[in-house]
Amino acid sequence: MAENFVVVDGGVVAPKGFKANGHKDRKYGAALIYSEADAVAAGVFTTNKVYAHPVALSKDTLVNNNVFRAIVANSGNANCFTKGGMEDAELLVKKAAELLKIPENQVLSASTGVIGRKMPMDIISLEVERAFENITMESSNENASKAIMTTDAFPKTVAVEFEVNGKSVRIGGIAKGAGMIAPNMLHATMLGFITTDIEISKEDLTNSLQKATDESFNNAVVDGDMSTNDTVYVLANAQSGVKYTDCKEEFDHALTYVSKELAKMIVSDGEGAKKLIEATVFGAETKEDAKKASMSIVRSLLLKTAVFGADPNWGRIAAAVGYSGAEMDMNNFDIIISDISSEKQAILVKAGEQIADCGTPELKLAEEIMKEDKIKIIVDLKMGSFENTAFGCDLGYDYVKINSEYTT
């Protein structure tokens, strides 16, 4: 469908009735997102069987409560696989609740950082206090976004607005993530926090978030590692005066856009990454096949390194699709590389026949496109009518350097 919204400034504080701020002192930081009115909430989490204490705590909180007011998040420590970790997760929530003067069961939490190390609660508590002090003075989406960064190179934020019967609805979000990105969040280190002022039921919000997640965060790959802490939350406080039942399609479309933009920012900021890769697979027999093939492309280390080196080695694309498990006919499929910015296209394979070979204009054009910082790979399987787009990044020297020194 055509875009029914406009992009606006403000991130999580763009919707009515939300405040946010954060504070970070070198390694450790904390962010607070607060709704001035009661809100409903939805969340999706990592499916990793080794999961962090705040994941376990917030899953339970979401199931057993219907009113929410805040999200608290810390960076620098994952609070995962440590003795006393659940108590620390509860203390983090308690600290935020006391400062905001709301019940503890109205606070959702998240953590990101090193796994297996005890939470320095004295430091984290101080960061939460500083975030609260900041939020009482002013609302700062940028500070909140920066406070949850770890190996991120830049803060990630987006917001949109659309109108329903003369009233404005806004959706805003922030995210963090650069490494350990291959989420699979069925019920997503990568953290995403989204706010909206629409009036919506908890059930509808959960369904909308799941659909948006499936099309965005669950299609994002940096390094193929699934974090123990992946989490996405949405808070909806009804302050716009617009009901979801009056704009289901428009809201779901806008929420998916916000989620996709955050997901693309995350993979663009893959540790040491220089290029964004979008892989779209058309003509698949099933949606599952389209996802298998597109994810296989962006997950391929050989393809990632080829993109890093601006090498139009289309054989790596063909191989990745071939081993993905998707149904295909090697004698009847297309591969195209295009530049997202200029829409230049190079046809590499057509109906199973090689088009780009040494010395051909197609290969020369592909070489030029591969030098760009946003590259789209298109594969038509010619097996059916389903499609999927996955997001990834190149893989270079800096990824090894950053991750070999992460705990030192």
Swiss-Prot record:
Keywords: Acyltransferase, Amino-acid biosynthesis, Arginine biosynthesis, Autocatalytic cleavage, Cytoplasm, Transferase
Gene Ontology CC entries for this record: cytoplasm
Reaction(s) this enzyme catalyzes, per UniProt: N(2)-acetyl-L-ornithine + L-glutamate = N-acetyl-L-glutamate + L-ornithine
Top EC category: transferase
Site positions per UniProt: Cleavage: A188, T189
Database matches in InterPro entries: Arg_biosynth_ArgJ (IPR002813), ArgJ-like_dom_sf (IPR016117), ArgJ_beta_C (IPR042195)
E.C. number(s) listed in UniProt: 2.3.1.35
Keyword Amino-acid biosynthesis set for record: yes
Binding site for substrate: T150, K176, T189, E271, N403, T408
Subcellular location(s) of the protein: Cytoplasm
Residues at the site labelled Involved in the stabilization of negative charge on the oxyanion by the formation of the oxyanion hole: T112, G113
Gene Ontology biological-process annotations: L-arginine biosynthetic process; ornithine biosynthetic process
Pfam hit, one: ArgJ
UniProt cross-references to SUPFAM superfamilies, sorted A to Z: DmpA/ArgJ-like
MF (Gene Ontology): glutamate N-acetyltransferase activity; L-glutamate N-acetyltransferase activity
Active site: T189 (nucleophile)
Pathway, per record: Amino-acid biosynthesis; L-arginine biosynthesis; L-ornithine and N-acetyl-L-glutamate from L-glutamate and N(2)-acetyl-L-ornithine (cyclic): step 1/1
Entry function: Catalyzes the transfer of the acetyl group from N(2)-acetylornithine to glutamate, forming N-acetylglutamate and L-ornithine.
HAMAP family the UniProt entry points to: ArgJ
Subunit and partners: Heterotetramer of two alpha and two beta chains.
Assigned protein family: Belongs to the ArgJ family.
Protein name: Glutamate N-acetyltransferase
